[in-house]
From Swiss-Prot:
GO terms for molecular function: ATP binding; protein kinase activity; protein serine kinase activity; protein serine/threonine kinase activity. This is Probable serine/threonine-protein kinase WNK3. Gene3D superfamilies: Phosphatidylinositol 3-kinase Catalytic Subunit, Chain A, domain 1, Phosphorylase Kinase, domain 1, Transferase(Phosphotransferase) domain 1. Residues 442-451 have a biased composition (Polar residues). Keywords: ATP-binding, Coiled coil, Kinase, Nucleotide-binding, Serine/threonine-protein kinase, Transferase. Residues 22-280 form the Protein kinase domain. The gene is WNK3. Its EC number is 2.7.11.1.
Length: 516
């Protein structure tokens, strides 16, 4: 709290009738019909949003106000991960306002968030779309169905840290619906389906509005921005003329999906049908997950051994942010029989790179196609961006010290040789045991730990072996130093992309560290 407990009540400029919620002066957002303030739930100790809507003379009688209150208060029963939590509401008869307490999203609405983060991949937009549609399926499945009627990017809110998207302003939509007179329509013309103007509509008006939301997210253009007033928008909408922004959608799949959303009501798909559309279906959560974790690697149990050329496209990566630096990613592979297998693994944005993780995954899962590495790496980059738009992937090529450090640690290399054919680069993984060279000295060897007297012949052999092994180590170290110098100089002569491709084909572990 910004002041001591004795003065805490002075921070609030208004308190709800129960004394539980206190409103601050800070305004989080403003709309045509409401203002949203920062508020505090004293019982739970959490910040909330205090939505205050000014009522007009359409609610002149107490019966009208009570009817409105009952309709809005029913929203408290709505509980879904894609719907903003609605805590309580009440009517202030003295000031003619209705107040709604909801959860607060400090990242703002989706329109503000999209303007702030220009570089959002299509995959992130698909994830947001799925969440919105899942919320609409929930609303539309009620009996009678709950229709939002004023869905737009301004009424969809996002938690930037988690990538959560939730539909909001349902209470305001209900108020506006109740406020309609016989011959007037209150809403946002750019997002209103043609049938809304005729006041003969169903849940599909929300699908139309969702399509316009997606159009705005893709193009950064408000629908029908070519029009100068609401009358022009009305004429275009009722005449079936699509917004000019649709022409700026260059991806044919995206455009086709948006057109399905804003089609004539007789041809428009429901939210449930859209979730099954091929455009979004590949991102649907699989209920038969086969997952495992390894502290220092990735377990391939349950994963297909190899992807054919036709199956590369049936590979996806999904993620969920767990803390400030860690995102748990899920690699999903579909085999030739159509069976889906998943593997979950942590990705630390501070220490991991998509390229090194992709290389290790391909090796662990025995995926031999070089294309799989770049495909997985790009998917990981895209997924991380969907959770952290400001994240910058680590790129290749750096100072000589990093190269020297990596080359001087042969344990990081997977192959037994470099292109030169020298096999001394090969080094066993930790715990490899008997995979080591039979001539390498071992700390637990009988040679070094044998007890008791030793005969003269054995002693001579031991002495000569120690001398030979010492000389061998010195020669190997000298060759390593020569190779370090040769490889370092060699890599300097080529662009980063060429070096990266070469390291991919060599299947070198930690290749990002080699070059960054």
């Amino acid at each position: 709290m910004r002041q001591d407990e004795n003065n805490s009540e002075e921070e609030f400029v208004e308190i709800d009738p129960t004394g539980r919620y206190g409103r601050y002066k800070e305004v989080l957002g403003k709309g045509a019909f409401k203002e949203v303030y920062r508020a505090f739930d004293q019982l739970e100790g959490i910040e909330v949003a205090w939505n205050q809507v000014k009522l007009d003379d359409k609610f002149c009688s107490s019966e009208d106000l009570d009817r409105l209150y009952s309709e809005v208060h029913l929203l408290k029963t709505l509980k879904h991960k894609s719907i903003i939590k609605f805590y309580t509401s009440w009517i202030d008869h003295q000031h003619m306002t209705i107040n709604l307490i909801t959860e607060v999203f400090t990242s703002g609405n989706l329109r503000q968030y999209r303007k702030k983060h220009k570089c959002v991949d299509l995959r992130a937009l698909k994830k947001w779309s799925r969440q919105i549609l899942e919320g609409l399926v929930y609303l539309h499945s009620h009996d009678p169905p709950v229709i939002h009627r004023d869905l737009k990017c301004d009424n969809i809110f996002i938690n930037g840290n988690q990538g959560e998207v939730k539909i909001g302003d349902l209470g305001l939509a209900a108020i506006l619906h109740r406020a309609r007179s016989a011959h007037s329509v209150i809403g946002t013309p750019e997002f209103m389906a043609p049938e809304l103007y005729e006041e003969d509509y169903n849940v599909l008006v929300d699908i139309y509005a969702f399509g316009m939301c997606l159009l705005e997210l893709v193009t950064f253009e408000y629908p029908y921005s070519e029009c100068t007033n609401a009358a022009q928008i009305y004429r275009k909408v009722t005449s079936g003329i699509k917004p000019a922004a649709l022409l700026n959608v260059t991806d044919p799949q995206v455009r086709a999906f948006i057109e399905k959303c804003i089609a004539k009501v007789s041809q428009r798909l429901s939210a449930k049908e859209l979730l099954d559309d091929p455009f979004l279906k590949c991102y649907k959560e699989n209920t038969e997950n086969v997952s495992s974790h390894k502290e220092n690697g990735y377990n391939g149990n349950g994963i297909v051994d190899k992807l054919s050329d036709s199956e590369v496209g049936l590979l996806t990566v999904e993620g969920q942010r767990k803390d400030l630096n860690t995102i748990f990613l899920k690699l999903r592979i579909t085999d030739s029989k159509g069976q889906i297998r998943n593997i979950h693994f942590p990705f630390n944005i501070e220490t991991d790179t998509s390229f090194s993780v992709a290389i290790e995954m391909v090796e662990e899962l025995d995926l031999t196609d070089d294309q799989d590495i770049s495909t997985i790496a790009k998917m990981i980059d895209t997924e991380i961006h969907s959770h952290i738009p400001d994240w910058t992937p680590s790129r290749l090529i750096g100072d000589d010290s990093a190269v020297q450090k990596c080359l001087s640690s042969p344990e990081t290399l997977h192959l037994d040789r470099f292109p030169s054919g020298r096999k001394f680069w090969s080094s066993p993984k930790a715990g490899a045991g008997d995979s080591r060279s039979p001539f390498a000295p071992r700390s637990n060897s009988k040679l070094s730990s044998a007890q008791g007297p030793i005969n003269q012949e054995v002693g001579v052999i031991v002495e000569k072996l120690e001398s030979l092994l010492r000389k061998q180590r010195e020669e190997i170290e000298e060759m390593q130093r020569d190779q370090e110098r040769i490889v370092t100089e060699f890599l300097k002569e080529f662009p980063p992309e060429i070096c990266e491709e070469a390291l991919v084909r060599l299947q070198v572990k930690d290749s990002d560290n080699l070059l960054c």
